[in-house]
Every structure is written in structure tokens, then in C-alpha cells.
């Protein structure tokens, strides 16, 4: 573990040494610690951390009285739905792939009709203005990027249907609306400062300008780190709860479609749980950006990559870690670097033991080689969770760039 200190706070980063922390990641962490909104909170960065868009991935922070919407970002409520299925059920992997593609929209596409689980999501209560009917048609669709459907198997022969997805376009709208609110809040303060300066100048009280500005306790912040507080913060958390619920039911809808199509019955189901890794834990007042909750005895999944599968773990409730853990292996290469440097031949070879029709140029940025090795994560997570099983993928599907 290393510690990084900034102007307003410090953060523990759960890597062995600075050599395992990329420079861009270090700079993002330091930038956050130099912002006023970080003051007084407990910030912990997970071992799978890497530089992200606007915020370091693997970030956790306890909420005091301020939140930056761009920290969680647009993929609100992104997580993984896991259904453990008895080894007595027979899977035909070729048919599973066919059934998935026939029933689950991927990439930019969405459903033609609304799924019945839309009744569990009340978009009418959103403060964020949206096209309700358009958003509801996205419930039950996978999306693109690193979102996937997967079938894994454990050492006992039992199966795990894993679905990784988020709140789709709804998350974009919610994040954009509230970050713009935060920027407007900041700009209003700038205007207020300017008016104070102008008034004091008119009155010949230039010497009092700095003392008056100091009373406001307001500092300049970049737009992407503008924060909400007070009633606006309450409004943001209200919308976050709805968007996170949307993401949950969207994954459940995809699971429902596959179970119906394959005739998976209750008697076949051994367990079911959900692990979210991009959200605000409203009950416990913790932000997790690329991090999962690991409260005591909580069962969770930590995916590694398309070839090596996932860890099934049980939380230890480590409060020094914000009761959190890594949400995956963490990227070793950015998407652009992966697309430029990785070869299709190596990608295909790494996936030889997994049935998939998704190994193509459009998904090469999700190649196993683009992620950190599993061993690096296993070395550091012992204080936050117990590894129960390592499950191996036998089928995987992802949207490619053209979908």
C-alpha cells in the first residue's frame, strides 16, 4: 500500500509500490486530493486502478457534503448480475450464443417493445429531463465497450450466467444534467465574486477585496470537477437511485429473456446475486467508481478477463478500505493502445478454450492481454475478501464496434 498526499486530503492506494501505478493515474489521484470537495472524506483507491475519463478507475470516497457527478460518470449503476445454475442443466453453447443474439440487443441497438420489468422503474420521478419511452426501450439491452454476457463453470461443474451492463443512455442523461448543474453552481459563484469585486472598487475599498473573497471560501475548479452540495446534491442522489435501479432491472431483464428461451427453471437455480461497481452507495454514503462493496460476508464477483474468468469472493468488511474491493483486473493498456498494438492472432489463441463469436477486430481492445494479470490482484485482496472460487469462462459474447 502507498499513500498519496494532496492539498486537502490524502489517499491510500492498494498497490505494492509506485512502479505499479501509471503516471497518468497518479496525476488524476493527486488532482482529486487537491480539490476542496475531497476535504474530510476517506479516500481509498483499489489495486486495479488506472487512469479514466475524468476520474481514476478504482476510486472510493466517503461522502461528507459534496459530490462531483463526473466522478461516477455516465455508466451509472454498471455492474454484474450472476445466476448460479446446477450442473444438471445442459448447455449447448452454440445454441446459447444464437439465443442471446436473437433476444438481447447489443451495442447501440435497443428493444422493439418494452420489457415487463419496466414496471419496476419509475422514470416519471426523475428530475433529469429525458425521453421516457426511448429510455425504457433500452432496459434489457447490453450496450457495448466492456459489457458482456458470459457462461462460466466452477470446479464442481456448476454454471454461472454472468451479465455485465449499466444504465445505458439514461446514465448519460443523468450525469450530463447534474454535472451541468454543478458547473452552473460554480459559475454563479464566479459571478458573485465579480460583483463583490466591482462593488468594492466603486466604493474605493480595494484593500478589502481579498478579505471579502476569503469569507466566501470559494476556489476555482475545473468544470469536470465542479461539485454539488445542499439541495442540488439531494436532487442528484435522488436521480442516481432511480438510474441505479434501472441498471439493476435491465440486467434482470436480460437474465429473464435467456432463462425463458433456454427453459431454465427455478429448480436449476442454486444462487443469484448482483455486484455493482460504478455507483453511489446511498445508504452508506460511499462513492465507488470502478470498485465494489465488500461488506462482511457479502458475496461478490470480480471479473478478470475474457479468458481467465472471475473470482467469486466473500467480503470481510474492512472499513479502512471503505468496505470496498477491486471491480476487476484493471486495464494494462488503454483501448486505443490495445487496438494499435495487439494482434488478432494472439487474441484468437488466448480465447481457444472459450466458445465465442465475438473475437474480432471490433473487440480486440477487450483482449485478455489488455488487462493486468490475475496474480497481481490475488496478491493484494486478502485484507478485504476471501476468494471462494475461481470460475472459468466457456462462452462469451460482446458487441463489436459495428453493432
Locations of the language-model features?
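Acidic active-site catalytic centers that drive phospho-/nucleotidyl reactions
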Residues: 47-48, 75
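A generic, well-ordered mixed alpha/beta core segment in the N-terminal half of proteins
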Residues: 69-125
Amino acid at each position: 500500500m502507498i499513500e498519496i498526499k494532496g492539498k486537502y486530503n490524502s489517499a491510500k492506494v492498494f498497490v505494492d509500490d509506485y512502479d505499479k501505478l501509471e503516471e497518468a493515474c497518479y496525476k488524476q489521484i493527486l488532482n482529486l486530493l487537491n480539490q476542496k470537495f475531497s476535504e474530510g472524506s476517506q479516500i481509498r483507491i483499489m489495486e486495479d486502478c488506472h487512469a479514466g475519463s475524468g476520474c481514476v478507475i478504482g476510486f472510493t470516497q466517503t461522502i461528507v457534503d459534496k459530490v462531483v457527478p463526473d466522478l461516477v460518470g455516465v455508466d451509472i449503476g454498471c455492474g454484474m448480475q450472476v445466476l448460479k445454475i446446477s450442473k444438471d442443466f445442459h448447455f449447448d453453447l452454440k445454441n446459447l450464443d444464437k439465443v442471446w443474439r436473437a433476444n438481447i440487443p447489443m451495442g447501440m441497438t435497443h428493444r422493439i417493445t418494452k420489457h415487463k420489468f419496466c414496471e419496476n422503474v419509475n422514470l416519471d420521478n426523475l428530475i433529469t429531463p429525458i425521453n421516457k419511452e426511448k429510455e425504457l426501450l433500452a432496459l434489457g439491452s447490453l450496450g457495448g465497450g466492456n459489457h458482456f454476457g458470459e457462461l462460466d463453470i466452477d470446479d464442481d461443474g456448476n454454471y454461472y450466467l454472468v451479465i455485465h451492463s449499466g444504465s445505458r443512455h439514461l446514465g448519460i442523461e443523468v450525469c450530463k444534467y447534474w454535472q451541468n448543474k454543478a458547473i452552473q453552481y460554480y459559475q454563479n459563484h464566479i459571478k458573485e465574486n465579480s460583483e463583490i469585486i466591482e462593488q468594492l472598487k466603486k466604493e474605493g475599498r480595494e484593500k478589502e477585496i481579498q478579505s471579502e473573497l476569503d469569507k466566501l471560501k470559494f476556489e476555482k475548479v475545473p468544470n469536470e470537477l465542479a461539485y454539488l452540495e445542499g439541495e442540488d446534491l439531494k436532487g442528484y442522489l435522488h436521480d442516481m437511485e432511480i438510474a441505479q435501479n434501472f441498471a439493476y432491472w435491465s440486467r434482470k431483464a436480460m437474465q429473464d429473456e435467456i432463462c425463458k428461451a433456454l427453459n431454465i427453471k427455478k429448480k436449476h437455480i442454486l444462487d443469484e446475486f448482483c455486484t455493482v461497481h460504478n455507483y453511489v452507495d446511498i445508504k452508506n454514503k460511499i462513492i465507488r467508481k470502478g470498485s465494489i462493496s465488500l461488506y462482511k460476508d457479502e458475496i461478490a464477483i470480480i471479473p478478470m478477463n475474457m479468458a481467465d474468468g472471475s473470482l467469486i469472493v466473500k467480503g470481510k468488511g474492512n472499513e479502512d478500505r471503505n468496505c470496498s474491493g477491486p471491480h476487476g483486473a484493471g486495464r494494462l493498456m488503454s483501448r486505443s493502445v490495445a487496438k494499435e498494438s495487439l494482434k488478432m492472432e494472439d487474441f484468437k489463441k488466448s480465447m481457444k478454450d472459450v466458445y465465442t463469436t465475438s473475437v474480432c477486430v471490433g473487440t480486440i481492445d477487450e483482449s485478455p492481454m489488455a488487462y493486468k494479470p490475475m496474480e497481481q490482484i490475488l496478491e493484494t485482496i486478502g485484507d478485504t475478501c476471501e476468494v471462494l472460487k475461481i470460475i472459468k469462462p466457456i462462452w462469451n459474447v460482446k458487441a463489436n464496434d459495428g453493432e
